[in-house]
Every structure is written in structure tokens, then in C-alpha cells.
Amino acid sequence: IVCFDRDVFGDCPDFRFPETPEGPRPTFGSILEPAPPEKYILTDRLWDYLQRYAEKHRAKGNGFGFGLANPDGVSRTLSARYYKDGSEILIVRGKRKNPRRLTIVEAARLMGYGELVKTRDDVPVSDTQAYRQFGNSVVPLVVTAVGRQILEVMKTRIDDEKGFTLLKQNPRSKRRRKALRTS
């Protein structure tokens, strides 16, 4: 959601969400580690539980369950609850093998932090906290692109005066506002 103050920007500022970049998109498999630690493989007990839980809700007509991610496709959404059982994004390991969860490095790559997180040691918190933080995060490239579009709209209302950057008052504004001073 992007909002602008009507008193400053009017009823319909010329904001446009950024276009999706052209060209090939990365696949889910491109973020996966070749030999992840075994601790990320679901136990027989957890895998059985998730399958029973999904079947119970499927019978009721609900959409609850787990999500198996196709390495050749795109990922499902990583949420802050991922640390609990990883059920939103489970990685297929082959027939008769329990799926696995994302590693912390893979979760970082998925959310756009691949340049900052090369190894597990680059994340100074527990797995639980890392999954929560990555799951609550917004992909930095998306925030950057939306932020640039917001700045374009803001530039239409900016006036340089005596070394200060001021937002111009909308002439149709009902109430007078003090100019915002930024550094």
C-alpha cells in the first residue's frame, strides 16, 4: 500500500508501481544449497503429521496443509512462522524421502539477502529468530523499486529555498501546513 497526503499531493498523485523486470526469472532451485545439513530434513513423525493434517483439511474443503516447492518453479511465500515446521515451503528430495525445510542461507537468498549471507555464520541469531526475521522481511529490491517511484512523486512537490528542501503546499489544501524540513 502506498499513500500520499491529499493536502500536499492532491487527490490523484501520478504514482505507478514499478514494472516487473524483463528477462529470465530465477528458479527456486537456483537458491538451493547442494548438500544441506540433515537437520533440515523433516522427521518421519513431522512428515506423517503434516500429511494427515493436510488430508483432514482437504476432506473438510479447507486449504490448510503444506506446500511442496518445485525447484524448476517459483517459491511459495516465506512467513515468520516458518520456524515451526517449514510447511509452507518444503523441498522435495525424491520418492520415498521426507522433504526438507529451507536452510537459513536459502531463506536469506529467497528474500534477497544472498549477497550478505554466504554461510550460516553470517546470521548471528538462532534458526528460529532468523526464520522469523526473514519471514517478516520485505525483499530489498522490491522496497528499493517502490521507494524510487515514491520519490518521483515527491519530486513533483519539492522546492529548494535558502538551502532547505521543502515540500510545497498544495494550493487546494484546506488547512495550512508547515513546510517539512529534511536534511
Predicted regions and their residues:
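A helicase ATPase "motif cassette" and its flanking acidic/Ser/Thr-rich regulatory loops
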Residues: 139
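Short, flexible loop/turn segments with low-complexity composition
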Residues: 14-17, 156-172
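FAD-binding beta-loop-beta segment adjacent to the flavin cofactor pocket
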Residues: 82-127
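Acidic-aromatic/histidine active-site loop/patch
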Residues: 143
